Amino acid sequence: MSKESQVNKCDRYTWSQTLNDCTLSIKLENPVKSKDLFIKIDNDHLTVKNLITNDTIIDGKLYKNVKKSDCNWTLESGKNLEIELFKLKGQEWWSCIIQGESEIDVTQIKPQNSSLSDFDGETRAMVEKMLYNQNRKAQGLPTTDEEEKQRIFETFKNEHPDMDFSNAKFN
């Protein structure tokens, strides 16, 4: 997955993020096996320890809550630990991973363009409708909402032929 923010460096790890997840990368000094690591991901806390050296790499309260059941970690070549945290409330930037650590300026993050296929069905339909209506307005044509209002008005006029709408004004 491509990360939308630049790589951010902390004392013991680097991290990057998208609006929905954060990925931490930890370079271990000496190769270890996964059983040599203690990694505990709670909804609001992260602990990473090297059991061989008894070194605590990370132990702190997360910036915001995560979906604990979706989070995971992998160890590559015994030296590269990667932890993926899925944000409980997506569609937001985190200024840090662990509270109290140095923070980044989230207003400086330049997200990548997203594709309509990145959205769930309901959101995608809403975005497609907005784009369609924007295009219609640019062409001087009525939007879907304006067309619907006009259709309802025409139906009402047909159901009430005895009413005079000649001087009616609508915005």
UniProtKB/Swiss-Prot annotation:
Q: Where is the CS domain?
A: 8-98
The UniProt entry, under PROSITE patterns, shows: CS (PS51203)
One annotated GO molecular function is: unfolded protein binding
Q: Where is the protein localized?
A: Cytoplasm, Cytoskeleton
Q: Which UniProt keywords apply?
A: Cell cycle, Cell division, Cytoplasm, Cytoskeleton, Karyogamy, Microtubule, Mitosis
Q: Which GO terms describe its biological process?
A: cell division; karyogamy; protein folding
Q: Does the keyword Transferase apply?
A: no
- InterPro entries according to UniProt: CS_dom (IPR007052), HSP20-like_chaperone (IPR008978), NudC_fam (IPR037898)
Superkingdom, according to UniProt? Answer: Eukaryota
Kindly report the protein's main subcellular placement as a broad class.
Answer: cytoplasm
Q: What does this protein do?
A: Required for nuclear movement. May interact between microtubules and nuclei and/or may be involved in the generation of force used to move nuclei during interphase.
Similarity remark: Belongs to the nudC family.
- Name recorded for this polypeptide: Nuclear movement protein nudC
Lineage of producing organism: Eukaryota, Amoebozoa, Evosea, Eumycetozoa, Dictyostelia
